[in-house]
Each structure stands twice: as C-alpha cells, then as structure tokens.
C-alpha cells in the first residue's frame, strides 16, 4: 500500500485530501499503461470506533494505492549490479517502450510541451536549482559548459523541435525512465510513471528514452545503452530527427 504525504514541493502539491485522492487515481491510470497487474487500484482509508481501516465504509481520511509487491532483487538496477542483464532484455524493453510510445496520448495541449518555450523553461529551472551545487557536485566550468551547450542547441535547432511537434512525437510519456523503476521478474514491469506534474511526462519520446539510455551509460553499460537505442529505432521506425534531438 502506498500513501502520499501531505507536502508541497512546488513541482508537486499533495496538501489536501482531494488532491491526494486525485493523484492516487492518476498514478494508477498512468502506470496501468505499462504494468496493469501491478497497480491494483485506489482504496479509501477510513476511521471509525477508534480504528483505521483500508476500504472501510466510514468517511475517508486518506487514500492509498494498492500494488502488487515484487522482490527488490528483481529491480533492473540490482540485476545490472550483479551482471544479470543481457541484450535480450534490452530488445524486450525496446519493444515494450516503442509500443508504449506509439499508443501514448497526444493532443494540442500535450504537443505544446515540446515547444522551445517550455523546453527552455525546463532547462532554465534545472540550472537554477543546481546552481547551489557548483563547487560541491559539479565544477563551475562544467556547469557553464553544459548551460552554454544547451542554450546554443536550443537556438540552433528551432526547426527540429517544431518538426517533432508536427510529427506528433510529443506524448504523455513515462517521465522517469531509469533502471530503478524497472522490474525484471516473471516479465518486465516498468512502473512509477510521473503522476504529479504534467510537465515531467508530457515530453518528446526521445526525451523519455534518453533518461534510460543515460542511466545505463552512468552505470558503465554503454553496450546495453547502444543496443537499446538501436532496437528502439528499429521497432519504432523513428528517423534521423529522433537521433538528432
């Protein structure tokens, strides 16, 4: 059972019971797209006669997401650490994600999140939030190089971003694809999609994929990252604009 804390971090707001109920329902809706049998549903937590009950008949005081529990050792991040992930797993994930992205929703609102304006806003926010870590986890030279490179790319590739929008490549994606959100068990479960902020999941499918590819490279598995990218391109039919962006 998963309960949301009544917190407000700016990018997420769970401060009212109604908001927590809504985001519990969104979490189930979004994650059933990739692992329906892992997300069982949303249940009220009630209080009566001095006792809390899950699914009771009293007035709800909280809501919870009921999920199927899987063993932590089946996490892809753990299996990578033990050297248990091979190219077949990459092929399977590529097939799953290409199909998922093909079926994911898109509309005029979602497409707008692929605009230069919003992409730049996301990057500027990222740079603002990481500025305080200069000299601690990133050097000033590295920080400025990354910022300059990103801003130059955005200025130079306006037509590329417009093409991706017109080609309907901006979708309601997962938003947090990395090896810690994938179970390799009786089958592949890709879970924990972002429910609390549209701006994190309304994105180019290339951005969704890039997060997982980057994670594999960070874990020193460039071979698996390259395999996943190659197979995703094969299965999805994406062209040169996908690789360029």
Annotate the PLM regions:
Residues 1-174, 179-245:
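Conserved ATP-binding subdomain of kinase catalytic cores across diverse folds
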């Amino acid at each position: 059972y998963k309960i949301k804390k009544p917190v407000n971090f700016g990018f997420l707001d769970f401060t009212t019971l109604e908001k927590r109920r809504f985001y519990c329902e969104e979490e189930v809706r979004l994650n059933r797209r990739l692992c329906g049998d892992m997300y069982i549903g949303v249940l009220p937590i009630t209080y009566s006669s001095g006792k809390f009950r899950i699914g009771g008949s009293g007035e709800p005081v909280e809501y919870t997401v009921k999920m199927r529990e899987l063993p932590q050792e089946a996490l892809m991040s753990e299996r990578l650490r033990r050297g248990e992930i091979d190219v077949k797993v990459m092929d399977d994930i590529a097939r799953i994600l290409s199909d998922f992205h093909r079926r994911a929703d898109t509309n005029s609102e979602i497409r707008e999140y692929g605009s230069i304006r919003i992409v730049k806003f996301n990057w500027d926010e990222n740079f603002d939030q990481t500025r305080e870590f200069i000299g601690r986890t990133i050097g000033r030279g590295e920080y400025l190089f990354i910022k300059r490179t990103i801003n130059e790319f955005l200025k130079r590739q306006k037509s590329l971003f417009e093409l991706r929008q017109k080609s309907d490549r901006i979708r309601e994606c997962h938003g947090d694809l990395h090896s810690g959100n994938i179970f390799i068990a009786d089958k592949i479960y890709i879970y924990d999609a972002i429910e609390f902020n549209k701006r994190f999941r309304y994105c180019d499918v290339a951005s969704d994929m890039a997060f997982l590819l980057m994670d594999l490279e960070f874990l020193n598995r460039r071979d698996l990252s390259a395999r996943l990218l190659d197979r995703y391109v094969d299965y999805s039919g994406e062209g040169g604009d996908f690789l360029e962006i």
